[in-house]
């Protein structure tokens, strides 16, 4: 059984009655959140979670080969009412689903960051990156502040990306099927609109 534990570590909390739970989660660089869970990211020297809220005892935390997933068990699926503080050493990819909310009060400063929001979820960050890749879909929303030299953004299916306060040198933006993208671009933008998508440019482009 030991070799299985190296591939996937699952922390099931449903057997505990306490509502305030803290645990180490091991090394990871990819994060996925489900079920309306609210997650605050905090840069740290350790990888750990602090879980509170009505459904904290029904939270499942799974780390498989550096991919960390946090969700509720089947009985409480989609219920939300769970707050997580995630202390992390490194993170390169953040994905949210099913009404989850992921945010950070601190600036995420690193070379590259990949953000994906799906199915009514929301993400909100201050960033300082060289490469920023952003995708929103199916009614989700992403709010971005700070700066990134290059920003590649795709929005679709009624989703929103609000990046008016994100300073860029170059941006590639695609909006389709009723999605809305709001951008501020310092130097250059390549914009593509399809099937009722909207891209609002809040500064002049320079060629």
Regions found by a protein language model. Name each.
Residues 1-207:
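Intrinsically disordered, low-complexity terminal regions
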